[in-house]
Amino acid sequence: MTRATAIGLGSVSGVMAMALALATSCGGDEAPPQGGAGSIDGGSDGGARFDGSASLDASRAIDAASDARTDARAGDASVGNGRWVMGYYAGYERDAYPVAAIEWSGLTHLAVAFYLPRADGTLDESLFIDATSGPALARALVAAAHANGRKAIASIGGAGMHAQWVGATSSGTRAAFIGNLRKLVADYGYDGLDLDWEPVDPADAGAVLAFVQALRAAMPAATLTMPTGYINANAPDDLSLYSKLAPLLDQINLMTYGMAGAYTGWKSWHSSALHQQDPATPTSVESSVKAYLAAGVPAAKIGVGAGFYGLCYSPPVSAPMQALGASTIVADDGTMSFAHITTSYLTPQARHYDVAAAAPYLSFASATGPQGCGFVSYEDEQSLADKGAYVKAQGLGGAIVWTVNQGYLASAPLGARSPLLVALRKSVLE
């Protein structure tokens, strides 16, 4: 931060102002400071382009900002005892989780989602908000992360961006795209990039590897992470690409949530079962981890996923491992947030814990709640304790959260508003 300020990057004044405002906000449930994202000046047009003929001074500014972040990261090693919890903060869910309320004790990295690649190698920086408020939110998040000794990561892509990734990383646009990514990191003060290419089709493997190789060469000090899919044991994927990517990446995080559905041949199942799968319930965290390990990905590079949302099955299903009949998934990510589940569905009578799968669920005899659920699969403190114990026992790198916004209980007492992040702190980081 200090060296970046000295070289006069255009975005730093807003970042530093927010950092000062949030410097004492480490306990996420403390009273918020004055101001917030709305008080931070913008500084991006939401779609900046990188000029390949940019001046040497601009290039040096980018490099100097990278050096500054490298210096700052030297003090991060003790956070989490070498393990990580990276939480995704979705711009479109900003109202659900104020910046000043973030529970930093449960995080080592905050991934700001999403910057959208364009096929021509440029970026949409609006974060699903607009060209002014999106960048302002990003600057507030970066400042708050750094004020609390955590890393801020720019997440690129997301679901539905496959064609754009293919275009941006083609041989004719790759260099410009990497230039744009370097500029994004420098402009906002990010510590690195999360490369969310979904899906990675078999035909994409060569382009993905060439892109990540070039990106690592251009940004040797940056934190580079990549989320990847879970494994369906009935139809396992070729994971050989990830053993080649592992030396280039700091984290390979498995999106082991939302791993169930009303699919032909399936029974009802948990969103994120830790253990146990059979042909009718062919997903679990454990089976996905084993597949990536078998493909040659080092355990210390692997993170597992925790969804701060649930799945709602309609009746007649009322529990896991049941025949589906006419049941469907009627609500999931974005609607069935942990916050919504706790206020609209959770009761002591409805809650059960599947010890074999290490997963909680809610069971109802008839359609219940706003979505008419018969069976709700979700994460809670007990399942996250089991998941964290598994991470440690297997020597894995850590965990990711999709999304931290959905786990915030705004009406709970101070100190109890981010219980899932607190649970991950205890189980993964301590």
Predicted regions and their residues:
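Conserved, mostly hydrophobic/aromatic
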Residues: 110, 154, 195, 252, ...
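Structural recognition of alpha->loop->beta junctions
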Residues: 102-112, 169-197, 239-259
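Active-site and adjacent substrate-binding regions of carbohydrate-active enzymes
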Residues: 173, 182, 186, 194-230, ...
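Ser/Thr-rich, Pro/Gly/Ala-heavy low-complexity intrinsically disordered linkers and tails
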Residues: 1-2, 6-12, 16-80
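Substrate-binding surface in catalytic domains of secreted glycosidases
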Residues: 86, 119-136, 197-341
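A structural motif corresponding to the C-terminal end of an alpha-helix
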Residues: 140-152, 187-190, 218-222, 248, ...
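Glycan-binding loop/region signatures in secreted carbohydrate-active enzymes
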Residues: 106-107, 126-127, 263, 301, ...
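Glycan-recognition patch characteristic of GH18 chitinases/ENGases
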Residues: 79-185, 318, 350, 416-429
